[in-house]
Amino acid sequence: MNQSEPDPTPAAKGPLSGLRHWQRQQQRKQRTRAARLNIIGSALRLLDFNGIDGDYVEFGCFRAETLPLAHRINQTLPMQRHLWAIDSFQGIPAAQGFRDLHPRWSEGRKFTSAAAFQRHCRRHGVPESAMTTVVCPYPELNALASDQRPDNIALVYVNCYLHSQVMHVLELLRPRLKQGMLIIFDNYFAYSRFHQSGDRAAFEQFQRSTDAFHFCRYQTFGFAGCSFITEEHFA
C-alpha cells in the first residue's frame, strides 16, 4: 500500500487503455498525497496549538513522499521543528516472520536510495539545514549514536512496511514517549486475508508492554492510515 491505492484493474493492451491506466494512477497518487498532507497538517497544527515542542521524525522514506509535505506545513507555523528521515534506504527487506507477509510487500520493492531521497527533498524546497537523513537498518536503530537519533520528538510518521520494522521503530520510541506526542501509521489497516496488519499488530503488542502511557486514536486517513495521541496515565 504505502497509502498508494492498489490498482483495481491491470493495464490492458493498446495506447488508449495505457493512457487510461496512467490517468488512474495519477488520480490515486493525488488522493494519497492529499490525504497525507491533511493528516500531517492537522497533526502539526494540533501540536503547535497545544504547545508540544519536538521534532518531526519519519521512518520509511520511499520517494520522499512525506517529508517535503511536513516541511511545507512546518514553514507556516510559529513552532519550527527539525525534520528527521530515518530508513535503511534499501527497499523492503526479507520477511522475518508470518506477520511480515502481505500480498503487496515484496522484498526489494519500495526502494529509494538516500541520495535520491535527498535530491527529491531539495527539489521540493527542503534545505539541508532543515533535515537530517539517517541511513540505518531497522534492527540497528537502538544502536544509533546520540547525534544520529532524535531525542525530543513531537510527531512520528511510520511509513515502513513490515511488522518487524515497526517493532524496531517502536522500541526506539519507547524511552522517548511523552505527553502529547503524535504517532501516524501509514499502513495501519493493511491487513492480509490471514492476519491483522503488521503495523496494528506491532502497535497493540507495544501498548500492552507500555505501562506509563496509553494512546488515544486521533484521525484515520486515506484508506489504511491511522494516527494516535500519546497520553500519560492520569495526565
Locations of regions flagged by a protein language model:
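S-adenosylmethionine/decaboxylated-SAM
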Residues: 8, 12-34, 52-235
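Conserved alpha-helix/loop element of class I SAM-dependent methyltransferases that forms part
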Residues: 38-51
